[in-house]
Structure formats: structure tokens, C-alpha cells
């Protein structure tokens, strides 16, 4: 009976079961909730997916016509946090990364982490099996992992990002990139846009240097004949981005770049429930509750004492509200918590945000967190700390659904004022949230769109001599010197 159902499903969709390799090495929870949803959507459509990933989230599925095989690359999220903290990426107040920290030296630790993961015995054993795949999916932040497109050629390569793409992702597709005002590199947006073109030029040079150093490691690890990062990028046929283009300033892109609309991790998510004591406390918070979380990628143990005290002073002055604070146990135990604060190392975030008495969300402006807040109609106060969070916080403020503050300089009175403002104007904020949700409402579910374009790449991959098969532009992965200088006279 099961085989009959599978056969009928494939017949109805007109698809064939594909064998897909997904290489997803970054041990970041906010990344993997998106990647897992994508993998589950592929499996639901009867494809078989082998995932190389760290021990973080379980990708196993049951009762689907496809299957998931997990290859443990064994790199814990805690190791990742320590590596990032020790790399010098975070400078201000212990948790805020400004543009000056985006250097090849600081990012080499991440590249070496990828190298160590791919040297893992489980991964080496997998590579020795000489299996074949119909497609290789690689996370867009990990160009080093593009080597799997070479190892399993001629399978086409697809990149996926949990949110915004990097400038390198766009320029290799020959989409618009590196405009200091309209389409800045995420690092250049970290402060106040000072420096403009000079910042973009510096970041371009830093990432070119990082690519050259990655080339050296790739040849050490996989042999002298291993292609360079630039050459490996040429194998990428499709870039999937888990956000709506309105957040990316409606960037002009070719068909090889697909915005999924955002909320991919929410597409098939089951409703979460609060535990009874927490639900009771929120029910009793008649004036409202404020939820404070800086996401899974920030090690709250690294918060400097001055910033920590600023937060505590803010919470104490919000004494008519319950404050739910996601923070490591060691931090909570080291301070005197105000009586209105409940500190825990983990909350069921979607369930908390959906409670009727939660009136504001203090967030680092991570894309997944903001998607959840918008779904729950909760206004935000953004304290961005790294990467694309600075740009995203500004966009949320521009759309009128959040207040964005300078995390490196904000004081307790300023933070308290912002929180009280979004609470006092809650109805206006929720009305604008409803308008924004209507704008970004999906024409197609993000998981369905991701599967559709993945299947398209696989379907036409064998027609290598047919120009119409590709979603890429004719200028894809062309060096700027060739793109702007070489043309027929």
C-alpha cells in the first residue's frame, strides 16, 4: 500500500524521486530551522536527501514518501559560539560587531571550522562511498562547502540562505550588488553607512583575500587539482533566499536568484504550547509582558558588565510589566534580577509571542525572530548586533513595525522609552504589521516555491548544450574586469 501511494504521488506531480546532497555545516540554530524546513519539504515531495550537518537539530522525518539520511559533522553550537567570540568578531559591549571586525583574519576561524568538519570521520567515510547525486545544496554563507559540487560533479549546485544573501552570492549571479546606499554589503550596513564606497571596496578586498586563503586550504584537504572558490562558484545554478524582496530594497536579480518570501521555517511548523507555570504567569500579567531575546547565535555570557547593567536597569524601570528574558543560566545566577523578571535559557518563542498579553519584543532583529513577531502581531524594539541585523532593523523601523536602536550606545532610559513607546502605540504598530503582512503575503508557500525551483534545476541539468535550460545570466560569475571592459567593438 505504501509503495502504491508513493507511485500515485509521483504520477500526480509529474516528478521523479531525486537524490539530493545537502551540505549545511554552520552550527547556528536560526540557520538550521530554515534548512530543516526545506529538507522536509523535499522529502514530502518524495525526494531522498542526505544531509551533512553538525549535531544541532534532528532532521529525521516519519511517514513521508522520501527519506532523510543524516551525516554527523560533529561541531556543537557551543563550540561555534566560542570560536566566533574568540575570533575578534565581537567588540563593543561584548556582543556587537561593527564593520571594522569584518576581516579575512577574523573569518578564517570559520573556514578552518568547515575544514575540520569535512575531515570528520563520518564525512570521510561518506566521501569514500563514491555515491552520485542529482543535486548538491550548499548553504550560501559557506563557499568552502562548494567543493562538494566538484566532488559530486556533474550534479548542479544550489545555494540556500536563511535570510539575506552575501554580496558574493549576488555578484556571481550578476545581480546588482555592492551599492553602498541601495544594496550595501551587510557588513557595510553595520554602523551608520559612513564610508560608503570605501567600505564596500574594503570589504570586497577582505573577502577576496578570504577566498584565496580558502583556495589554499581546499587544495591541502582535497588535492592540488581542486578548483578555486571562483571556479566552484560557476557551478551554482540557483540561489534561494528566505525573505521577501521588499526587505532587500527590491534588488534587481535574474531568475537564478529566487526570493522565497520569508517564514520558511513556519510553513510546516506545528503550534507550540507554553508550559503551565509560564502560561499562568503571563495570564496574570494584566498590564502586559515584554519578551527579551537576542537569538541563538549570541552568547549572553559574553555580554559586558556595563551592557548587562543597562538591561537590568531597564527591566527594573518596567516594573508594571512582566519581563521574560532569554539568557544563559550562569548570567542570570550572577546578577540580582528585578522581581518582575523571569530569566530562562530557553523559551518556546512562537508560543510566547502568540500570548495575548505579550505587548513588545526586544530582539536582535534576526530574520526568523522578526518573522515570528510579525506573525504574532507583536511590535519590536531592535538591538541589532551583527551582520544583516543592522539593515533588517532599519527596514523594520522604516516599515513602522519596530523601533531600531544603536546597540553599541543605547542607554537604559533610551531603551525604556522605546519599549514604552511601542506599547503605548501598540494599536498603530499592529495596524502597520497587518499592512506589511499583506504586502509580503505569499503567492506560493515558501516551501513549495523552494521545491519547485529545486526540481526545475534537476529536471533540465542533463540538457547541458541547450541554452534555455539555465536560469543564469550570460554574465554569471564573470569578473568585473571582463564584465565592464571586454565587449565587441
UniProtKB/Swiss-Prot annotation:
Residue ranges of coiled coil: none
EC number of this enzyme: 2.4.1.-
Top-level enzyme category: transferase
Signal sequence residues: 1-17
Domain of life: Viruses
Pfam families xrefs: UDPGT
GO MF terms held by the record: UDP-glycosyltransferase activity
PROSITE patterns per record: UDPGT
Alphabetically ordered keywords of this record: Glycosyltransferase, Signal, Transferase
InterPro entries, alphabetized: Ecdysteroid_UDP-Glc_Trfase, UDP-glycosyltransferase, UDP_glucos_trans, UDP_glycos_trans_CS
The protein's role, per its UniProt record: Catalyzes the transfer of glucose from UDP-glucose to ecdysteroids which are insect molting hormones. Expression of egt interferes with normal insect development and block molting.
Entry similarity comment: Belongs to the UDP-glycosyltransferase family.
PANTHER family (UniProt xref): EG:EG0003.4 PROTEIN-RELATED, FI06409P-RELATED
Protein's name in the database: Ecdysteroid UDP-glucosyltransferase
Primary gene name: EGT
